[in-house]
Amino acid sequence: MLNELRYELGKTPSISSAVALKAVFPGCLLTLAVMPFSSIIAGWLFYLTGSLSVFYVATHLRTIIAAKRLLLIPLCLLAIGLTNLIWYHHYYQPDSLLPYVYNAYRTSAHAGILGAFILLTVLHISQKNRQQPLFYIIAICIFALGYAFYQSLFSGMHRIGLVFGTATSAAYFLTFIGALSAQALLKLNSTYKYYLYLGHFLLVTVAILLTETRAAIFVYPIVGATILLSEVRHSKPLFIKAFVGSSATLLLCLFLFQETIHQRVNDLINDVHSYSMNNSRTSVGARIAMYQSGIEAGEEALLGQSAEQRAERIVAQAEQKPNLAGAVEYLDVHLHNEVIDAFSLKGLPGAILLVLLYASLFYFSFFVLRSHLSAALLFALLMYGLSDVILYSRDMLIAWLMAFCLGTTLTGKWLKN
């Protein structure tokens, strides 16, 4: 009944419907395509797509509200975006010593609000008009991989970063577009699609290894293998071949990049050892220090506080506990954990809204759409949110949202009707 209602929404011809059908999906595709080369232009495309989606939602408000189960994720995104804006306008001062923190929350708030409307529009376009732009999605991944390998070979960069600058952001983007294009490959009507998938799996994994981002090196192989195995789970021979093929691909990557992986594992062990010796001025040690100090700072301001107040509390903690000193170096950015960063600045309301978003994504992925791709993207979002922030970063939030929106056209319960 829910799906039938959803599909009826796109049947009434109108200018706004035509705009949504002709512009929203191309807007999502163009945003993803341009992002690894220019995050500024990608942002403009996203804002244009979001503005068109606002127009569509405003002219279809009654029918959109009727499909209540499809409102959960957009409402949570909208609430988080509005909360971020309220926090920004309440605490920001022009002479702030931490402008990056405020600017990041402001821009991510805009992305979250417009993303909510884009997702609403995508979910309410009728099934027969939902585009499955397989070749465009695959092409986007090819261009992103080409740029990544170009940087590795000719730019002299130790860790590739695409246009984002930081290798971690590049790894996250490659994970999202890699998962999306992997599913697109599996939708092809070709006897060679599984071989193409394994080649794609190899190339994306290699590109992520070139970023040397530990979280992504762990997460993407799970995401990629899960998508493939979920697709062939009803055929035992195919499942066995897929398992062997994905395992062989990972073993090949381990062999080709054994020095890189060995070095990153050693760095992890050394960082943990340093933290045990009260030295938190390492990558892992600083994260542990940020988690502890962020929780303690949030507990002292359960209804929220400014970035300056949080910084003062964490500096005071570091003076009393030297093992928390590593957190001080990151006070002008974020605390490298989605929930803790939200809790430390927006208090319990901010943390609760974030948990509600995760819960709504879980409910939608497993009980509404029933999509293994949506579940894989949720897994990536959760795992990256443990040691970094995605919703706090405008570019990564946009990339994840566009991948999630386009992913609803590729797999799921209602595509089988």
Where are these regions (language model features)?
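Transmembrane signal-anchor hairpin modules in multi-pass inner-membrane enzymes, especially those
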Residues: 1-94, 121-131, 135, 184-192, ...
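Alpha-helical transmembrane segments of multi-pass inner-membrane proteins
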Residues: 28-29, 113-156, 165-233, 256
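Perimembrane helix-loop-helix junctions
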Residues: 54-61, 221-243
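A membrane-periplasm/extracellular boundary helix in multi-pass inner-membrane enzymes
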Residues: 231-277, 295-299
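Long extracytoplasmic/lumenal interhelical loops at the membrane interface
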Residues: 281-285, 289, 299-346
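Hydrophobic transmembrane alpha-helices and their immediate junctions
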Residues: 345-379
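Transmembrane alpha-helices of multi-pass inner-membrane enzymes
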Residues: 377-384, 391-417
